[in-house]
From Swiss-Prot:
Descriptive protein name: Zinc finger protein 24
GO CC terms in record: nucleoplasm; nucleus
Secretion signal span: none
Function, in words: Transcription factor required for myelination of differentiated oligodendrocytes. Required for the conversion of oligodendrocytes from the premyelinating to the myelinating state. In the developing central nervous system (CNS), involved in the maintenance in the progenitor stage by promoting the cell cycle. Specifically binds to the 5'-TCAT-3' DNA sequence. Has transcription repressor activity in vitro.
KW Aminoacyl-tRNA synthetase (keyword) present: no
Gene Ontology terms for molecular function: DNA-binding transcription activator activity, RNA polymerase II-specific; DNA-binding transcription factor activity; identical protein binding; sequence-specific DNA binding; zinc ion binding
ZnF segments: C2H2-type: 251-273, 279-301, 307-329, 335-357
Segments of this protein annotated with the region Necessary and sufficient for nuclear localization: 251-301
Pfam families with a match to the protein in the record: SCAN, zf-C2H2
Similarity comment text for this entry: Belongs to the krueppel C2H2-type zinc-finger protein family.
Protein modification: Sumoylated.
Source species of the chain: Mus musculus (Mouse)
Cross-link (Glycyl lysine isopeptide (Lys-Gly) (interchain with G-Cter in SUMO1)): K27
Length: 368
């Protein structure tokens, strides 16, 4: 992106998989005080997330000099935060939201971003909704399994709408299972018994809730956690959530007796029992339990792919697809086998690799 004077057009090149490049011209004007104003038609701009990513990934080598670099960063930041249409409080919330999502484990980052929260409160509500669906030690095992199945169905239906191959769907399913268990484990650290070396021993039901393979090995997600064949290890209490003791859970599920502090959380929870899917697609009739999932599904019909790779321009309908794709460029392989140390960029490949270890173990047992 080249630097332009205030009187000239500022050209932002947005990669597009269907074209070599799509040029968005933003006419900048000069106000009476000599500062930069704008006659931008905000409705025709790409999603602010595109400009946020460009702002964060901008490099000094992308500009001819320091003055041009500052100018381009200022423009990208303006197109992200949009001070012409947002209040100071809204801009503050956008910055807080970005940092909050950034400190979450990667799987939870994907889950939150798929729901497109516009501020910190909406992001918290997304996590609280997920939290309300997770295991409750006082509930029957069958109900806990049913909850997990509902969550897995939601995320896999999102990726199925994108037309991913079965191997990628397996990866998404397992990512949600382990991210859900992670959030539950972090919340209930004090309720779990510790092993001799300080690792937390999870509930036995979690092992039976997954597929026939063993745990996903070491998952390097930037937080001190270790997923190793059914054992979870991380500093006790570090991520414990502090609740407001004055906040009472006044909403009770008539089916299972679980309490909720918000009526909206109870409504979502009750769909586990009723199987209700009130959000239907007018194009194909497929129904979903949440409106956010319907929005994701509708991209099958519209062809919308708002998540673009800044490296090659390839576009995706889901943010999780973009995250997986970017590992091709970065070479990141966060999924490591604890038995041999081999790493993979996709969790599905790790699971497939671990099945070979399991088969070898079985053969050794048979030989003995």
């Amino acid at each position: 992106m080249s630097a332009q004077s205030v009187e000239e057009d500022s050209i932002l090149i947005i990669p597009n998989p269907d074209e070599e490049e799509k040029i968005l011209r933003v006419k900048l004007e000069e106000d009476p005080d000599g500062e930069e104003g704008s006659s931008i038609s905000w409705n025709h701009l790409p999603d602010p997330e595109v400009f946020r990513q460009r702002f964060r990934q901008f490099g000094y080598q992308d500009s001819p000099g320091p003055r041009e670099a500052v100018s381009q960063l200022r423009e990208l930041c303006r197109l992200w935060l949009r001070p012409e249409t947002h209040t100071k409080e809204q801009i503050l919330e956008l910055v807080v939201l970005e940092q909050f999502v950034a400190i979450l484990p990667k799987e939870l980052q994907t889950w939150v971003r798929e729901h497109h929260p516009e501020n910190g409160e909406e992001a918290v509500a997304v996590l609280e909704d997920l939290e309300s669906e997770l295991d409750d030690p006082g509930q029957p095992v069958s109900l806990r399994r049913q909850k997990r199945e509902v969550l897995v169905e939601e995320i896999t239906s999102q990726e199925d709408a994108q037309g991913l191959p079965s191997s990628e769907l397996d990866a998404v399913e397992n990512q949600l299972k382990w991210a859900s268990w992670e959030l539950h484990s972090l919340r209930h650290c004090d309720d779990d018994a510790t092993t001799e070396n300080g690792a937390l021993a999870p509930k036995q039901e979690m092992a039976s809730a997954g597929e026939s393979h063993e745990g996903p090995g070491t998952l390097n997600i930037g937080v001190p956690q270790l997923f190793k064949y059914g054992e979870t290890c991380f500093p006790k209490g570090r991520f414990e959530r502090k609740r407001n003791p004055s906040r009472k859970k006044q909403h009770i599920c008539d089916e299972c007796g679980k309490h909720f502090s918000q009526g909206s959380a109870l409504i979502l929870h009750q769909r586990i029992h009723s199987g209700e899917k009130p959000y239907g697609c007018v194009e194909c009739g497929k129904a979903f339990s949440r409106s956010s999932i319907l929005v994701q599904h509708q991209r099958v019909h519209t062809g919308e792919k708002p998540y673009k790779c800044l490296e090659c321009g390839k576009a995706f309908s889901q943010n999780s697809g973009l995250i997986n794709h970017q590992r091709i460029h970065t070479g990141e392989k966060p999924y490591e086998c604890v038995q041999c140390g081999k790493s993979y960029s996709q969790s599905s490949n790790l699971f497939r690799h671990q099945r070979r270890h399991n088969a070898e173990k079985l053969l050794n047992v048979v030989k003995v």
